[in-house]
Swiss-Prot record:
Record EC number: 3.1.1.29
Protein name: Peptidyl-tRNA hydrolase
GO MF terms, alphabetically ordered: peptidyl-tRNA hydrolase activity; tRNA binding
Role of this protein: Hydrolyzes ribosome-free peptidyl-tRNAs (with 1 or more amino acids incorporated), which drop off the ribosome during protein synthesis, or as a result of ribosome stalling. Catalyzes the release of premature peptidyl moieties from peptidyl-tRNA molecules trapped in stalled 50S ribosomal subunits, and thus maintains levels of free tRNAs and 50S ribosomes.
Key word Plastid present: no
Location within or outside the cell: Cytoplasm
Chemical reaction(s) catalysed: an N-acyl-L-alpha-aminoacyl-tRNA + H2O = an N-acyl-L-amino acid + a tRNA + H(+)
Transmembrane segments: none
Organism encoding this protein: Chromobacterium violaceum (strain ATCC 12472 / DSM 30191 / JCM 1249 / CCUG 213 / NBRC 12614 / NCIMB 9131 / NCTC 9757 / MK)
GO biological process entries: protein quality control for misfolded or incompletely synthesized proteins; rescue of stalled ribosome
Length: 193
């Protein structure tokens, strides 16, 4: 398998969304950028903030779309097209209602599960074959509460569990980047429960 060349963190721009559950993808790529001494810069042609880092000797692009969640695919397509990055070389990091806080899972392809960011990316890439890193945020219990729930800050114990899942995920990203996704999946799925 080829490795990951683009890691996209999903979220919404602006200070009012910064600490909300829906911005879990931003949290992970911010930490990744910091750990690997990258520098974010706003890039209009890619509709977002971008950074380039090196992991395991390979260049990896980081992207935070500034289009708001529902139009994330616009930014992903622009960068992927410009650098000739294939869908299976893209890892999209996003909040996941169907996993408890503290649980993180890699997955390739599949549906969008009602996540509008994933839906837009799959539509614009004309493929759902990109990789996902699903960061559990839990579910409010009532489907009608979802929109409100994802745009609120997690409780303190949930935030701690999310932070631990982010760190566990970051430990496995070098394997994912170097094309050892099966190993990364096994390690993460065993560790981040």
């Amino acid at each position: 398998m080829s490795g990951i060349r683009l890691i996209v963190g999903l979220g919404n721009p602006g200070p009012e969304y910064e600490k909300t559950r829906h911005n879990a993808g931003f949290w992970l790529v911010d930490e990744l950028c910091w750990q690997f001494k990258g520098n974010w810069r706003s890039e209009g042609k890619f509709h977002g903030d971008v950074a380039r880092i090196q992991i395991e000797g390979q260049d990896v692009w980081l992207l935070k779309p500034m289009t708001y969640m529902n139009l994330s695919g616009q930014a992903v397509l622009a960068l992927a097209h410009f650098y000739k990055i294939l869908p299976d070389e893209i890892l999209v990091v996003h909040d996941e209602l169907d996993l408890a806080p503290g649980v993180a899972r890699f997955k390739q392809g599949g549906g969008h599960g009602g996540h509008n960011g994933l839906k837009d990316i799959a539509a614009r890439l004309s493929s759902p074959a990109f990789w996902r890193l699903r960061l559990g945020i839990g579910h409010p219990g009532d489907k009608k509460e979802v929109a409100n729930f994802v745009l609120k800050k997690p409780r303190a114990e949930e935030q701690q569990a999310l932070d631990e899942a982010v760190l566990a995920s970051l430990r496995e990203l070098p394997r994912a980047v170097s094309g050892k996704m099966a190993e990364a999946m096994k390690a993460l799925h065993t560790e981040a429960k």
